C-alpha cells in the first residue's frame, strides 16, 4: 500500500517554506579588547620600528667603515714599500753630499756626468714617490714639532727663537696625512723665546 499523500505533502512544505519570511540573524559585536591590549600593540610596533632604525644605522656605519678602509688601503698600502725606497733615496743624497762643491766645479766631464746621473736618478725616485702619495718635507726655519720631526741635537743660535729648526740632518716624508718618516733635525738653543700666538688683536699684557 502506497502513501498517496507523499508528493502533496512535499509540495505543501515547499510552498510554506517559500511563504515564510527570511529573518536575518542579529550581528553580534565582538568582545571589547582586554585592557592594555592596544598599548601592547603600540609598544610592539614602536620596538619593531626602533629595531629597524638601529639596523639601518648599523648598515650605514658599516658602509662608511668599509669605504674608509678601502680608501686607506689605497692611500697607505704602499707604506712599507715606500719606506724601503726611502733608503735608496737617502743613499743617493749621501753620494751627492759626499762630493764637495769645489770638487764639482773642477770635476772633469766624466765625474760631472756621473753626478748629473745620480741627481737625475734621485729626482726620478722622488717623483715616483710623489705619484703614489708620498711627499718630501723640509722643516728648516720652522718651529720644532715633535709630531713631524725628531730632534737629534741642540744648536746654540741666538739669532733665531729657541726651538727653531736650524739644521735638517735627514728630510722627512709624509704619506697622505700621516708621517711616513719624521725629519731628523737640529734645534736652536738659547735664542729669544718664540713670540706668543695672537689673540684676535687683544693685548693680554698686564
From Swiss-Prot:
Disordered: annotated segments: 1-36
Similarity-based family: Belongs to the GrpE family.
Protein name per the record: Protein GrpE
PANTHER family to which the protein is assigned, alphabetical: GRPE PROTEIN, GRPE PROTEIN HOMOLOG, MITOCHONDRIAL
Function: Participates actively in the response to hyperosmotic and heat shock by preventing the aggregation of stress-denatured proteins, in association with DnaK and GrpE. It is the nucleotide exchange factor for DnaK and may function as a thermosensor. Unfolded proteins bind initially to DnaJ; upon interaction with the DnaJ-bound protein, DnaK hydrolyzes its bound ATP, resulting in the formation of a stable complex. GrpE releases ADP from DnaK; ATP binding to DnaK triggers the release of the substrate protein, thus completing the reaction cycle.
UniProt-annotated location(s): Cytoplasm
Pfam families listed in its UniProt record: GrpE
Assembly behavior: Homodimer.
GO cellular component terms, semicolon-separated: cytoplasm
Entry keywords, A to Z: Chaperone, Cytoplasm, Stress response
Lineage: Bacteria, Pseudomonadati, Pseudomonadota, Alphaproteobacteria, Hyphomicrobiales
Entry GO MF terms: adenyl-nucleotide exchange factor activity; protein homodimerization activity; protein-folding chaperone binding; unfolded protein binding
Origin: domain of life: Bacteria
SUPFAM superfamilies in UniProt: Coiled-coil domain of nucleotide exchange factor GrpE, Head domain of nucleotide exchange factor GrpE
One Gene Ontology biological process: protein folding
PROSITE patterns in UniProt: GRPE
InterPro entries reported in the protein's UniProt record: GrpE, GrpE_coiled_coil, GrpE_head
Amino acid at each position: 500500500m502506497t502513501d498517496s499523500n507523499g508528493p502533496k505533502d512535499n509540495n505543501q512544505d515547499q510552498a510554506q517554506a517559500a511563504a515564510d519570511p527570511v529573518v536575518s540573524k542579529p550581528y553580534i559585536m565582538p568582545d571589547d579588547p582586554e585592557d592594555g591590549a592596544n598599548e601592547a600593540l603600540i609598544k610592539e610596533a614602536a620596538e619593531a620600528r626602533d629595531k629597524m632604525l638601529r639596523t639601518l644605522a648599523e648598515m650605514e656605519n658599516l658602509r662608511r667603515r668599509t669605504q674608509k678602509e678601502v680608501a686607506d688601503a689605497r692611500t697607505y698600502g704602499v707604506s712599507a714599500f715606500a719606506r724601503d725606497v726611502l733608503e735608496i733615496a737617502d743613499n743617493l743624497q749621501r753620494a751627492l753630499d759626499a762630493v764637495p762643491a769645489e770638487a764639482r766645479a773642477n770635476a772633469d766631464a766624466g765625474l760631472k756626468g756621473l753626478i748629473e746621473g745620480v741627481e737625475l736618478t734621485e729626482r726620478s725616485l722622488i717623483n715616483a714617490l710623489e705619484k703614489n702619495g708620498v711627499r718630501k718635507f723640509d722643516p728648516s726655519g720652522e718651529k720644532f714639532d715633535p709630531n713631524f720631526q725628531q730632534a737629534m741635537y741642540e744648536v746654540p743660535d741666538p739669532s733665531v727663537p729657541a726651538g727653531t729648526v736650524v739644521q735638517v740632518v735627514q728630510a722627512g716624508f709624509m704619506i697622505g696625512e700621516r708621517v711616513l718618516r719624521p725629519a731628523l733635525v737640529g734645534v736652536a738653543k738659547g735664542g729669544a723665546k718664540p713670540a706668543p700666538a695672537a689673540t684676535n688683536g687683544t693685548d693680554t699684557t698686564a
